[in-house]
Amino acid sequence: MKVTVCFGRTGIVVPCKEGQLRVGELTQQALQRYLKTREKGPGYWVKIHHLEYTDGGILDPDDVLADVVEDKDKLIAVFEEQEPLHKIESPSGNPADRQSPDAFETEVAAQLAAFKPIGGEIEVTPSALKLGTPLLVRRSSDPVPGPPADTQPSASHPGGQSLKLVVPDSTQNLEDREVLNGVQTELLTSPRTKDTLSDMTRTVEISGEGGPLGIHVVPFFSSLSGRILGLFIRGIEDNSRSKREGLFHENECIVKINNVDLVDKTFAQAQDVFRQAMKSPSVLLHVLPPQNREQYEKSVIGSLNIFGNNDGVLKTKVPPPVHGKSGLKTANLTGTDSPETDASASLQQNKSPRVPRLGGKPSSPSLSPLMGFGSNKNAKKIKIDLKKGPEGLGFTVVTRDSSIHGPGPIFVKNILPKGAAIKDGRLQSGDRILEVNGRDVTGRTQEELVAMLRSTKQGETASLVIARQEGHFLPRELKGEPDCCALSLETSEQLTFEIPLNDSGSAGLGVSLKGNKSRETGTDLGIFIKSIIHGGAAFKDGRLRMNDQLIAVNGESLLGKSNHEAMETLRRSMSMEGNIRGMIQLVILRRPERPMEDPAECGAFSKPCFENCQNAVTTSRRNDNSILHPLGTCSPQDKQKGLLLPNDGWAESEVPPSPTPHSALGLGLEDYSHSSGVDSAVYFPDQHINFRSVTPARQPESINLKASKSMDLVPDESKVHSLAGQKSESPSKDFGPTLGLKKSSSLESLQTAVAEVRKNDLPFHRPRPHMVRGRGCNESFRAAIDKSYDGPEEIEADGLSDKSSHSGQGALNCESAPQGNSELEDMENKARKVKKTKEKEKKKEKGKLKVKEKKRKEENEDPERKIKKKGFGAMLRFGKKKEDKGGKAEQKGTLKHGGLREEELEKMKEERERIGAKHQELREKQARGLLDYATGAIGSVYDMDDDEMDPNYARVNHFREPCTSANVFRSPSPPRAGPFGYPRDGHPLSPERDHLEGLYAKVNKPYHPLVPADSGRPTGGSTDRIQKLRKEYYQARREGFPLYEDDEGRARPSEYDLLWVPGRGPDGNAHNLRFEGMERQYASLPRGGPADPVDYLPAAPRGLYKERELPYYPGAHPMHPPKGSYPRPTELRVADLRYPQHYPPPPAPQHKGPFRQDVPPSPPQHQRMPAYQETGRPGPRGGSPDQYPYRTQDSRQKNPMTAAV
């Protein structure tokens, strides 16, 4: 085998044959090879103090290599080297100084070993110079110039006194360091500590109120160990306070501030200490001059490695291969910064007469998990006899991956739940197998070992020799905790658990345990749960937690036993009684709060109250109420006692214990309060908690419940009621749960919802579409599809409610509304009412102004043009009519979805096309029976029948339309203006409905000149217009416009609708309802397409109209069809009905009735009329507004009358 010994950066490969050499012999061979490699002069020498593993473990020179290292392993040589000696000086002037090799070996060699860099030589680099690395590397009896004469003799290192002061002097500096690492020694009380520190440093006392010091500091890194020892003054500003008062000089180091040692504090921590100190009136600083820097660095290292060696005499045990008397160990030369390693290693080598070490045996060195495992020195050998039964030996093995140098050591991997191993209880996972049935397995492969074990027959006994390192299954010993190393019943809870065992494949409880041993006294402090194995019995039970101390198992107390005995007792009890009962009873001690290392309290652990809250909460989450009762005794005072849990679990894991599978942090938090035994005041006193308790009764107001995002964003709708209650009880802001009310809207994003909630600060509130973008889609969607809420919005304009309560959003929120708080909703509605009312008032004013301007323009315009425009607009709602519609909508409070007009227009076009296609078919079928039907319905129908009978009817209509279409539209448009005013003015138009309907049906459109005048008259609501309309009708018949009757009827229906619309105002509720329905239809149908007019035209017979008007008005059919089938179905129906109504077939009249109900929303009808015209001629149809003008100008184009047909 071969071993590589590293001298700094130089590696020396030493062949070791079969590994039978001792470590001391390896050291000598490595040294010889290294000297050859260096090729230095005769005065150059190197001394190796010891060899270490790469992780810091020290090898015993007496060990055999095969037992402690593997082939091709790397070892680190802790050595010192010296250039040829020259002039010898002793600046200290101490008569004890000697230049003999003995003195050199005893003092200097030991000291150099402590600070010699890994590279084997001191490298002076620019960075080192900036950090103030001194170039004088030899002092005292070293044959080189020493430090300046101002160095005090006690600080130098003459024989006899140098080490006496060097070793202890660092103890003061390392006081906090030792606390951090749990290294408690009597050096802390050594009187020489302060003396030594004062010898090397100077004290500077400054006032914290004098302003900034004007110094530039960087971390003070030790050139020997690389540790941070304080703050290095890199520069001083000119004209600064430090410069003026001469407080500091460049290259000095601040190592202590107000009795706070800066050793091993990070730069940020040191700066913070400095800042805090400057806030006090007086600041006491210990400043290290550049010349004493190395001495200070060495002393810091020395104290870590020679505990209590302060008698001035080097009475230390030196490794055999090195004959010097140095007990100092090179600190962290291997690149490891673990003071614990240094401490344990030095303890192994040194025996201090001044510091009695209780527990006589030194702690085992820290080794890598596998390297050196099972050696004579590092582990104890245990012989275990396992009787092979029907279930086998009951364990599995694993080997280290060592493909480079052959098979590695073989370890026990798992103990199976059944078999000889679990019954015996002694074999553990991680044990290294050395022998099987007397045969050495070192160097054998895993397959060979398995074959050897399987060769044991059932009933025979397999004899195993295993090596077990205590440190392998017991935790790294906690750093010194002399006064608080064990949990006490007074400061912790005693819990009893009955945990059922399972057959999940894991042995026993499924927990990994750790123990603690006091470094100072060496006594065992008990065993604790280090971790819970996933899938094991404890994991499934969910009540055990990390760092619980086991004090009894199945009624057998573990207190007073050593850690090893307690482990054996636990293992035996679980394997025997536990397996028999299927249940394990555990009594544990659980500390109420999880501590955190506090370097200021002598290694004591303390943690904010939050940790206590967290643990208590977790406890209540994981345990039954009966088990939680002991928590009731926990008080905030108990939390602040800073209990120390004597296991390294606290130091190892800074994060809270992982939640059990039964309660994930974000899911089961509401269960915290369910434990009756735990008073919320115990763990919710005054700290801010990052958990949210869903039970409001347990929530003090002082707690800021910043619920986790996972909880906020994914609330459970089933808890909305309780959350609503909580909102009223707790003043805290819980915006997460309120989102549950908005879950019904799939288009909204959680973020927008959260943003909205924050804005409104109302727990259950319907989002305003204009406030939150995420809900805009829903609003527009509703607006486009459901017109049923347009009417109610009219009421909103009066200040009765908000848009969101009636429009499409109302439907979205219908789910959440019942869940919400009615009071909150009322408040919200009121607030929104005020805003809405103001907005709508402004809109109304604007709308009124626009309407007035329009009226003025219209008055100035040619009456014929005005009528045409209105007629076209009424039918298609294009161009100017759009604005009219907007103004009217504003007046009525229905102007909500103006932005959707384009979409509606597109839909309207599609529906027109469909209606047109169907219209053509119906025309042909119904034309035949139209005469008979019309004759039966109206006396004047014979004229219409003639037109319909005529195959050129549609064309004739077009020819006639130019005039009649204008009339038709004229009459409807003025009535519209009038009716709109009427309904609001309350003028009664209902009595004239019958006459008007009949007249409109046939007379409405034929007369252009008369219609405008008539239109003005109908506005007034007089009977004169009816007479004129009749005259127009007869005149049209005479002129040979048979279709005019139909067209008139159809147009009249639209006009009639307009008139009827005004009538609803006077009618009262019924009319209002009708009007609302008509309005809705009006808003929807016109956009959807004007199909109703056609229906009305055929059904136009005056008698029919009159009869239908009354029933239809009461009927809600018109309203319903527009709502439900608003876009297409209604139009289709209308189309079908229109044709039947126009034509004699009986089914048509049946449809007529419902359609006429729809007819009231005449505006839609007009629109549909153009659709019909378009149907007749798809080309012109596209531009409905254009069609009308064309009709007027060119008789060949389709007329509105044709569309009506």
UniProtKB/Swiss-Prot annotation:
GO terms for biological process: cell adhesion; cell division; establishment of cell polarity; establishment of centrosome localization; establishment or maintenance of epithelial cell apical/basal polarity; microtubule cytoskeleton organization; protein localization. Residues 201-289, 383-468, 498-585 form the PDZ domain. One of its GO terms (cellular component) is apical junction complex. One of its GO terms (molecular function) is phosphatidylinositol binding. Residues 329-352, 806-822 have a biased composition (Polar residues). It is found in: Endomembrane system; Cell junction; Cell junction, Tight junction. It comes from the Eukaryota. The keyword Methyltransferase does not apply. Residues 838-865, 881-921 have a biased composition (Basic and acidic residues). Residues 356-374 have a biased composition (Low complexity). Keywords: Cell cycle, Cell division, Cell junction, Membrane, Phosphoprotein, Repeat, Tight junction. Highly expressed in kidney, lung and skeletal muscle. Expressed at intermediate levels in brain, heart, placenta, liver and pancreas. Isoform 1 is predominant, while isoform 2 and isoform 3 are expressed at lower levels. Belongs to the PAR3 family. This is Partitioning defective 3 homolog B. It comes from Homo sapiens.
